[in-house]
From Swiss-Prot:
Protein source organism: Arabidopsis thaliana
EC number, UniProt record: 6.1.1.21
PANTHER family (UniProt xref): HISTIDINE--TRNA LIGASE, MITOCHONDRIAL-RELATED, HISTIDYL-TRNA SYNTHETASE
One GO CC term, this protein: mitochondrion
Protein localization: Plastid, Chloroplast; Mitochondrion
Keywords (A to Z) from UniProt: Aminoacyl-tRNA synthetase, ATP-binding, Chloroplast, Ligase, Mitochondrion, Nucleotide-binding, Plastid, Protein biosynthesis, Transit peptide
InterPro entries referenced in this protein's UniProt entry, alphabetically: aa-tRNA-synth_II, aa-tRNA-synth_II/BPL/LPL, Anticodon-bd, Anticodon-bd_dom_sf, His-tRNA-ligase, HisRS-like_core, HisRS/HisZ
HAMAP family: His_tRNA_synth
Taxonomic placement: Eukaryota, Viridiplantae, Streptophyta, Embryophyta, Tracheophyta
Pfam families membership: HGTP_anticodon (PF03129), tRNA-synt_His (PF13393)
Main localization of the protein described in the UniProt heading: plastid
Gene Ontology biological process terms in this record: histidyl-tRNA aminoacylation
One Gene Ontology term of the molecular function aspect: ATP binding
Protein name: Histidine--tRNA ligase, chloroplastic/mitochondrial
Protein family per UniProt: Belongs to the class-II aminoacyl-tRNA synthetase family.
């Protein structure tokens, strides 16, 4: 029995839903009923008892419109063939994370809005899917996972011992301009280390990504990592007399260097109040691709240079030195980064950043927690799939079923169910043919699902407690007792 809730425009201070029952009946034609010209749907846009959000008006014409079968722009369906690829990718994420000793966590998709706007940066704030819920609370769909991680670490307090090595794979939402490999929803793999101040943490994180790339067939000639430090930009701004309070804004602008024309970068930097001379010098230094050249410009005594030298030394020890390069322009757009930052990039330049991360030592204290050192990375699913397509490295992942069980007589459907249950109890996958079908159809289905063997339940064999088994790869066929069927 179905019911539709329709709410009148405002009968009182609280909703009084009108219930229309028995709209659909299998034994009689649908009843005719009239729909008011103007309705308010209680479920739409979060409208509820608080009255905090006014729901859109729905007309009778709207009610009868054909539903758009496509998902909302920027989102995806995952039919079986795409789900197999997603599971394959996620399994690699999980296996690599566990290989490095990390534990899996997860967080709510819906969080308080303040969690993301406090320290995320202007770009993230502009891209939030946020709204007011029925309790007049500002909430948002998570655009990333790191703030949720910080919240959970603070919540757990002293019940967890440091260092923490956690990973997560979660769906994230950003209302951004879509490009190849960039959607408004995506799944993101994060690995984070809480409680380690040394550069060894960043070195291990990059090592884990390299391990992942190698597992799926990506080489150092396909992708690389651009590495720098936020402290480099801090020292440069200090050298050129740029006020410290402009640092966050400048980072957001510099992060666009490879995305918009350089004249636009200069114009945006000019709007911050930085002099033309300082802008020219700053951009000249940020074009440096050699750590030695940077050291000549800002001196070798700075903390940024020491950290970066150590990272490159550790890269040799971990065995991925050919994967990384210095690039002073890498700053990352998120406001909470404090030290080393890195981005994975496509060496052919056809895709945007594949992954990115860095150190965020002060993020937890921003939310009221202790000032723990921390670093991590985020790795989206959409870009890597595009890269695998580009390199012709997508795996062939057909459906795989060990057994197809089929009754040769409609009166033996119950017997076929018994056989299927016996095999499933032994941990084997079974596709049970639920209708009476000709053998030609069954063989076609077996080929489609890549079945290993066909188990046929015939009247004569079943009376003897046996079934016929056909091994599809070799054509071998034999009869076996149900109790001996493995």
């Amino acid at each position: 029995m179905r019911a539709i809730h329709i709410v009148t425009t405002r009968l009182s201070s609280s909703f009084r839903p009108i219930l229309l029952l028995d709209l659909v009946s299998s034994c009689s034609p649908p009843r005719q009923f009239s729909i008011p010209r103007r309705l308010i749907c209680a479920a739409a846009n979060g409208g509820g008892r608080s009255g905090s959000i006014v729901a859109p008006l729905v007309t009778e014409e709207d009610f009868h419109k054909k539903i758009d079968v496509n998902p909302p722009k920027g989102t995806r369906d995952f039919p079986p063939e795409d789900m197999r690829l997603r599971n394959w990718l996620f399994n690699h994420f999980k296996e690599v994370s566990r290989l490095y000793g990390y534990e899996e966590v997860d967080y709510p998709v819906l969080e308080t809005e303040a969690l993301f706007i406090r320290k995320a940066g202007e770009e993230i704030r502009d891209q939030l899917y946020c709204f007011e819920d029925r309790g007049n609370r500002r909430v948002a769909l998570r655009p990333e996972l790191t703030p949720s991680l910080a919240r959970l670490v603070i919540q757990k307090g002293k019940s967890v011992s440091l260092p923490l090595k956690w990973f997560a794979i979660g769906q994230c939402w950003r209302y951004e301009r879509m490009t190849r490999g960039r959607r408004r929803e995506h799944y993101q793999w994060n690995m984070d280390i809480i409680g380690v101040p040394q550069v060894t943490a960043e070195a291990e994180l990059i090592s884990s990504i390299v391990t992942f790339f190698k597992r799926i067939g990506i080489t150092a000639s396909d992708v690389g990592f651009k590495v720098s430090s936020r402290k480099v930009l801090q020292e440069l701004l200090k050298k050129y007399g740029v006020p410290e309070d402009l640092f966050g804004r400048v980072c957001i602008i510099i992060d666009k260097i490879e995305k918009i024309p350089i004249d636009e970068i200069k114009k945006e930097l000019g709007f911050t109040g930085i002099s033309e001379d300082a802008i020219e010098q700053l951009l000249q230094v940020l074009s440096v691709k050699s750590l030695d050249d940077l050291e000549d410009i800002i001196g070798g005594a700075g903390e940024a240079i020491a950290d970066l030298k150590q990272l490159f030394s550790l890269a040799e020890k971990f065995g991925y030195s050919e994967w990384i390069q210095f690039d002073a322009s890498v700053v990352r757009g998120l406001a909470y980064y404090t030290g080393i930052v890195f981005e994975g990039f496509d060496r052919k330049g056809k895709l945007r950043a594949i992954c990115g991360g860095g150190r965020y030592d002060r993020l937890l204290s921003t939310y009221g927690g202790d000032d723990f050192p921390a670093c991590g990375f985020g790795f989206g699913d959409a870009v890597i799939v595009e890269l695998l397509k580009e390199k012709d490295l997508l795996p062939e992942l057909g459906q795989e079923v060990e057994n197809i069980v089929c009754a040769l007589d409609k009166d033996l459907q119950g017997a076929a169910a018994t056989v299927a249950t016996a095999l499933r109890d032994k941990g084997q996958t079974v596709d049970l043919v639920l209708e009476s079908k000709p053998l030609k159809w069954v063989f076609k289905r077996a080929a489609r699902v890549n079945a290993r063997r066909l188990v046929l339940v015939g009247k004569t064999e079943w009376e003897d407690g046996s079934v016929s088994v056909k091994v599809l790869s070799s054509g071998e066929q034999f009869q076996v007792k149900l109790s001996d069927l493995e």
